[in-house]
Amino acid sequence: MDLNFDLYMNDVVEQARNEIEHAGYQQLTSAEDVDQVLQQKGTSLVMVNSVCGCAGGIARPAAAHALHYDKLPQRLVTVFAGQDKEATQQAREYFEGYAPSSPSFALIKDGKITEMIERHQIEGHDVMDVINQLQALFDKYCEER
């Protein structure tokens, strides 16, 4: 049996994109998209998506389920590390003081990083731990919606 790795990876990437988009996150695929959203006043949660196991098993489910909460960011967006390289690099310009990390979450307020949940805070944790971390950020920086 000959498995075409590129086709397989394309399917994995497409599934990962669809999963986070279905949860309500807007895909940012260019540097211009990133600047247009993150320079706005208010709060934006950026999910740095990836194809690693902890993204699919922990980060994306947490990104979806954390939204069942009273306080939420005004905007939910995602960039895809390793896929949308220009958008991901531009988003990381906003993550001042943090090393590149995927999957990860960054809460941006008025164009500036407030806090980040990095890969080491996701990998090896369960979904509920990450949901709690996200909702703690929402409590601290967001308003009821």
From Swiss-Prot:
The stretch of residues making up the signal peptide is: none
InterPro entries (alphabetical)? BrxB/BrxA (IPR009474)
Which domain of life does the protein's organism represent? Bacteria
Which GO biological process entries does UniProt record here? cell redox homeostasis
NCBIfam families xrefs? YphP_YqiW (TIGR04191)
User: Belongs to which family?
Assistant: Belongs to the bacilliredoxin family.
Q: What is this protein called?
A: Bacilliredoxin SE_1195
Upper lineage: Bacteria, Bacillati, Bacillota, Bacilli, Bacillales
